[in-house]
């Protein structure tokens, strides 16, 4: 790719809000279709739609505790992006543990929606697809978000918080793609559908 165009920072960019609004996770094997369906990153760096065979699990968290962080490194001419999703779930209880435990064995792909209205795919890469995968070449791309850690507990004092902080990490070979398709949460708020 030639460096033939720069970028412009507008006033709105300087006043953009930060923070994560919601986190959606599904197993890579649930991803049925992706648009555009190409074998390299789209030129405009967006995915316009994604359908799944099962709804996305929707994770809520304590306000201002969720984060998406990206760290790029270049080795032997290849740039890899380590993308981390972390969030804090307050109040340890069985229902929370059951949902979090499911992350220990899956191969998650995430959509991280920001308060700015932008959403980004984590754990999905066009650049590391299995070309023998037929109509779903992303199924075995090995860039999914793995559970890196679950940390938590309770403090000693009565007013201390208790809860768990979950961190998922994906090593992918392009910056997270912007997802511009629809996200529709279910009535109970536990899942969401994409289109």
Give short role names for the model-derived ranges.
Residues 129-195:
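Mixed-charge, glycine-accented linear interaction segment located at domain edges/termini
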Residues 94-101, 177-179:
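Short, conserved charged micro-motifs
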Residues 20-27, 85-90, 105-115:
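Short, hydrophobic/proline-enriched secondary-structure or compact coil segments at domain edges
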Residues 76-77, 100-102, 111-112, 156-160:
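A general structural signal for short secondary-structure junctions and capping/turn motifs
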